[in-house]
Amino acid sequence: MDEELKNLIKVWVSAIISISYCYYIPPRIKSGAPRFLSVSPVLALFLVLPLFFSSLHLSLITAFFLTWLANFKLILFSFDKGPLIPIPTNFPRFFCFTCFPIKVQQNPKSQNHLPKLVFAIKLAIFAVLLHLYSYRQNLSPTILLGLYFVHLYLEIEIILTFVKVVVFISLGCDLEPQSNKPYLATSLQDFWGRRWNLMVPAILRPAVYAPMRRVSERKMSSGWALFPGILAAFIVSGLVHELLFFYLIREMPTGEVTLFFVLHGVCTAVELAVKKKTTVAQRWRLSPGVSRVLTVGFVFVTGGWLFTPQLKRSGVMERFTSEAVLLVEFIKR
């Protein structure tokens, strides 16, 4: 643990120095290829930093914040696009909005408060979940898989809520939520675009979807050009997840997780095409309850088929849950 804490300090001091360079130097360079070249050493460094950790949690969190979010935001920043344009007014804001999955609320509410009851319930469920792992040998694979998905959702929610609160206290500005009750999604488009991990689609839209759609519009109508954009965004997301899996497993990718996102990209595109191009979908609509069951069920089944097998084969799922239990015990002390 002591060695991991030392690595944590080294990694994030390196991140602070790198982001400070990006704040003071590249903005003075012409946008486009010249500015991209100026930030490319930072992009390369952020690809390496997660490898400094043996802890799954520290490696994954660092990879998500730096390798994925920060790198994509800096690439967009190189071309005067994305959430870093206009450039934040001071370095602390620039650092937070570069590294963390947050953005300023466009229409701030008069009162911004943490939904304490909901957060407390999530913490309680997470505590019960960690306790259930003591009996994992008595649980069926299907139930255990369900627990893993709930664990993933709750841990992401808890970590991102803490980040949001710390940044809100530090910067004093209203921040948009990181997710919007993904378990209530009524379609794949609703799940991936408006409910799950909202900062990711907010980055993929300008970085991947919009450029691909513009290119596709040269060959087809604008109504059809959105489908290559959707598929491209899911493919890029799959490739990034392969990289995240590499940081966890330290083995060559198998392509399963990319296939998971390609499948969801194709299904989302088909779903959208049916809604837009057929009158049957407009006349015949499922009830919200049935739509939610089908959507969440599809994510669960395909996740068990393609997303988690590599993690289970490598023992990462067991290590990840055991590490969470040890972390809670460490905090209690």
Curated annotation (Swiss-Prot):
What would be an example GO MF term here?
Answer: long-chain-alcohol O-fatty-acyltransferase activity
Where are its TM segments located? 7-27, 45-65, 114-134, 143-163, 229-249, 254-274, 288-308
Q: Per the UniProt entry, what are the Gene Ontology biological process annotations, in alphabetical order?
A: lipid metabolic process
Describe its function: Catalyzes the final step in the synthesis of long-chain linear esters (waxes).
Q: Which organism is it from?
A: Arabidopsis thaliana
Which terms in the GO cellular component ontology are assigned?
membrane
What is the name listed in the Swiss-Prot or TrEMBL entry for this protein? Probable long-chain-alcohol O-fatty-acyltransferase 5
Report keywords, A-Z: Acyltransferase, Lipid biosynthesis, Lipid metabolism, Membrane, Transferase, Transmembrane, Transmembrane helix
Q: What is stated as this protein's family in its record?
A: Belongs to the wax synthase family.
Spell out the subcellular localization from the entry. Membrane
Q: Please state the Enzyme Commission number of this protein.
A: 2.3.1.75
Which reaction is recorded as catalysed by this protein? a long chain fatty alcohol + a fatty acyl-CoA = a wax ester + CoA
Return the broad EC class: transferase
